[in-house]
Amino acid sequence: MSTDNSQKDEGVPLLSPYSSSPQLRKKKRNQKRRKDKFVGHLKSDSRRPTQLLHDNLQHNHGQITDFDQIDSWGMLHESDSTSNDIIKSEDPSLKGAFIDHRPSMSQPREGPQSVSSTVQPQPIMKFSTPSYKKPAGLRPSDQNRSLVSDLSPSELESWLKRRKSVHKSFVDENSPTDRRQSNANNDVVIDVDALMNHVNNNASTGVNDNSKRRKKKRGSDDSSNKNSKSTSSDSNDEEDEYNSRPSSSLSSNNSSLDDVCLVLDDEGSEVPKAWPDCTVLEEFSKEETERLRSQAIQDAEAFHFQYDEDEEDGTSNEDGILFSKPIVTNIDVPELGNRRVNETENLKNGRLRPKRIAPWHLIQRPMVLGSNSTKDSKSRIQSGLQDNLLVGRNIQYPPHIISNNPEHFRFTYFRVDLDSTVHSPTISGLLQPGQKFQDLFVASIYSQDNSAGHIKTHPNSPTPGIKAETVSQLQGLTAKNPSTLSSMSVANIEDVPPFWLDVSNPTEEEMKILSKAFGIHPLTTEDIFLGEVREKVELFRDYYLICFRSFDIVAEKHVRRRRKEKQESATLDHESISRRKSQAYGATMSNESNANNNNSTSNASRSKWLPSILRARRRSSANRTTNTSSSSYKRRVKSEKKKMEENEKFKRKSGDRHKPREGELEPLNVYIIVFRTGVLTFHFAPTPHPINVRRRARLLKDYLNVTSDWIAYALIDDITDAFAPMIELIEDEVYEIEDAILKMHQSDDSSDSDSSDSDSDSGASDEDAFPFDVYSKKTSYSSAKSSVSSRSMSTSEASFNANLIGWKRKGDMLRRIGECRKRVMSILRLLGSKADVIKGFAKRYNEQWEASPQSEIAMYLGDIQDHIVTMVSSLNHYEKLLSRSHSNYLAQINIDMTKVNNDMNDVLGKITILGTIVLPMNVITGLWGMNVIVPGQYRDSLTWFIGIVLFMCMLACSAYMYTKRRFGF
C-alpha cells in the first residue's frame, strides 16, 4: 500500500494546497527548531547579523534553508534529510508547476499583464513588514515569518549580493499562480510550460505586428519608435539598429538609404516573384501625386491672392464665370506632366543633334494696356485669369522644382517600338491617362498591348492636356516594321523590346523606391547614390552593373564659350586702347600751345575746387568704412556657402571632393544597370549621351535587334567617342605650341636683320639721292627739329612695345603649355581604367553567365577597347611632345638671356672706350685748372693753349687706336 502511495505521489506537483497533516506538523517543528537555534546564535554572537548569516550559509546550509535538492532545471526544492517530500494535490491548475525560489521584484497585480509588456523594476520592499497577498491555496498555519526578515534592508541587500541570486521573474496573471511565504519570503510559483507557450505566441504575433507596422509606416524616421512601451517592439527596434545602413552625406528628413534592404525570397513559398514590383511604384505615385497637388493648390492660392480685391469689386457688375478657388489639373501641376519627343524628327539638313527642348516655356498672351477705361482693363485681366485657370497658360512653377532641378525632365522612358520618348520631371508623370506602371515595365503586359495595336498621336503634343478617353496608353508600332512583333510570343522574352528608364539627379527617396521596385542590391544603391569613382563591371543574380566615367560636356561648352568671349573682349579692348592712344597723342600735339596758355587759369580754378573734393572724399570714406565691414562679412558668408554647395553638388556628380581646377575636365559618373528586359541609367548632371543613343536606336531599329545589352554597349560607345574631339583639339594645340617655340628665336633674328637691312638701305638711299644737298639739310635741320623728335619718340615707343609684346607672348606660351598638359592629364585620368573595364565586360559575354547571354556585342566591345587604347597612346605621345616643348622653351629662354647679357657686355665695352679716351683729357684739364702757377701763365700768346689742345687730341686718337686693336671694336 505504501508503494502505491509513493508511486501515486510521484505525479503530484511539488506545491499543493492540501497535504497530509503529519508531514506538515513535522515540517513545522523542524522549521521552528532551526529558527530558534539561529536566533540564539544571533543573540549570543557579537558580530553583525549579516556576517553570522553568511557563515551559517556556508557551513550549515542545510540547517538554515528548507531547500536541499536541486532538479535538472537548476531549481531548489523542499525535502527532508533522506529524500524529497512529495506533496499531494488535487488542484489541476498546479499540476506540473515548478517552484522558483529566486527572489524577484514585486509587481502590481491590478490587472492582467502580458509577458511581452515591459517589466519596470521597483524598489525592494521592507522584509520586516511584508505586505503580500494571502495565497488562495495555503492554510493560515503556513504563514511563517522568514528568518531573514529580522535584518535591516541594507544588510539584506548585502546578503542578496553575496548570494548572487537577484533575478527577474515573470508571472502569467491569466493562469492561477500562488505565492507562499517561506524563508526567502519572495518565492514565486511559475508554470514553465504555460510561460513558454505564451512567449512563443507573443513572439509570432509581435513579428506579424512589426511587419504590418513597417508596411504601414514605410519611410518614416526611426525616432517614432522611442515611445513604444512593449518589450516586443523594443526588441525589434534593437534588432533594426544592427541592420546595414550605408552612410549618406545627402540624407533627408523623409527617407534615408538605410531603408533600402534586399528582401530575401522565401524558399518554401510557391508563389512566383513578380519583377518589377509595381505595387511599390503605385503607392509612391499616389503619395507623390497628392503631395504635388496640395503644393500646387497652395502656390495657386498664393499667386492669385493679389487679385482677390479686384474680383470682389467687379464680379457683381460683369458677366462671365470666375472661380474663387483655382482649378488644379495636370497642366497646373507641371511635375505630373510629360513631353513626348521623337529624336529622329530633328534631323534636318544633316543636323545630328536635337534642338533644345523647352516645353514649359509657354507663350504668354500679351495684355492690351492702351485702353483708357478702367472697366475694360479689369475685364481683360479677369478674362486672362479665366484663361490661365481653365486652359493652363502662364503656369507658375513651384520654386523647389526650379531651384533643385534646372533640367526639369529628370525621368525619361524609352522603348524602340514607341514613336516617341516620354520625358517627365517625376516618376508619376511618366504615366499616361488610364495607364499603370505594369504597362511600362512588365514585358509580358506591354508586349500584348503592342500586339493589339494603339492609336497614334502626334509625338510633340503634350499629353496632359488631352482627355483620358481620347488618348491611348502608349503609341503603337511604326509602319516601317510591322512584322517585328507580329509573330512574337510572350514566352520568348528575348524578342520583347526592352524598356529604358533614364534618371537624372535622383533624390534619396526616389532611389529607395526604384531599388525596392526593381530589386536592386543595396551595394549597387550605395555605389550609385554616394558616387562610386572606380570604374567597374559587377555581376549580380538578376542584372549586371557598369560604372563608367564621362566628362560634363555641357559645362565644358560653357567654359569654352566664356573663354572665347573673354578673348574677343580682350582683343577689342586692346584695339580701342591703341586707337585712343593715337587720338590722344594727336590731340596733345595740336593743343600743346593752347595748354600752355590755359595753365594759369586752370591752376587758379583747381585751387578752388580741389579742397572741396578732398572734404567730400573724407566724408564718403568715413561712411564707407562703416558699411563695408558688414557688407564684406555677408559677402564672405555667402561666398563660402555657395562654395560648399558647389562642392557638394560636384561630389555627388563625379565622386570627387573638390571641383577641378581651371583647364581640367569635370568628371561625370554614369551608372548602367542592365536587366534582361530593361535598362536603368543614373547620372547627376545633364548629358547628351542618352539622347544620342536613343536617336541611334531609332535610326537602326530596322537593321538590328535593339536589346538591353545593345543599349549598354551604345552608351559605352557614345561616352568613349565623346573623348575624340577633345583629343583632336589637344593634338592641334600641341603642334601649334611646338612650332611657335621652334620659331620663337628665328623670328627675333629675322626681325633684327630686317631692321638693320632697312636702316642701311635707307642710309645708302639718302646718300645716293642727295649727294649735293648736305648744306641744305643742315640749314633745314632747325626747322624740322620738332618733327624729328616726335618721330624718334614714336619709333622708340614702338620698339619698346614690340619688346614688351614679345616677352608677353613668351609668358603666354608657358601658360599654354601648362594648360595643355593639365588637360592631357585629366583626360588620361578618365581614360586610364576604361580599357580594363571593357576587357572585363567582354569577358562576361564570352563566358557562360546566366545574367549576361551570348551576343555579338562582344565583338563591338573589342572595337571600343581598341579605340580606348589608341586614344591613351596618343595622349601619352602628346604628353611627351609637351614635355619636349617645355624643355625647348626653357632653352629658348636661356638663349634670350644669353643674348641680353652679350648686349650688355657690348654696351660696357663701349663705355670702357669712352672712358679710356676721356680720362687723360680729364687729367690734363685738371692739372691746368689748379689754383697754382702753371707754365705759360704769364704769356700773352695762345701758344700753350693750342699746344695743350693738340696734345689732347693726339692722345685721344692714340687711345682709340690702341683699344680698337686690342679689343677688336
Swiss-Prot record:
Matching InterPro entries: Alr1-like, CorA_cytoplasmic_dom, CorA_TM1_TM2, MgTranspt_CorA/ZnTranspt_ZntB
Topology Extracellular: residue spans: 934-941
Main location, first listed in the record: membrane
GO CC entries: fungal-type vacuole membrane; vacuole-mitochondrion membrane contact site
Ranges of biased composition (kind: Basic and acidic residues): 1-11, 37-48, 565-578
Subcellular localization, as worded in the UniProt entry: Membrane
GO molecular function terms listed in the Swiss-Prot or TrEMBL record: magnesium ion transmembrane transporter activity
Annotated keywords: Membrane, Phosphoprotein, Transmembrane, Transmembrane helix
Compositional bias per record (Acidic residues), positions renumbered to this chain: 749-769
SUPFAM superfamilies xrefs: CorA soluble domain-like (SSF143865), Magnesium transport protein CorA, transmembrane region (SSF144083)
Ranges annotated as biased composition (Basic residues): 24-36
Biased segments, Polar residues type: 141-152
Membrane spanning residue stretches: 913-933, 942-962
GO biological process, one term: intracellular magnesium ion homeostasis
Pfam families with a match to the protein in the record: CorA
Membrane topology: Multi-pass membrane protein
Residues with the Phosphoserine modification: S114, S175, S182, S383, S576, S582
Sequence ranges on the Cytoplasmic membrane side: 1-912, 963-969
Region of interest called Disordered, as start-end residue ranges on this chain: 1-49, 96-153, 167-186, 199-256, 559-662, 746-769
Additional free-text comment from the UniProt record: Present with 259 molecules/cell in log phase SD medium.
Recorded family membership: Belongs to the CorA metal ion transporter (MIT) (TC 1.A.35) family.
Protein name: Manganese resistance protein MNR2
Originating species: Saccharomyces cerevisiae (strain ATCC 204508 / S288c) (Baker's yeast)
Lineage: Eukaryota, Fungi, Dikarya, Ascomycota, Saccharomycotina
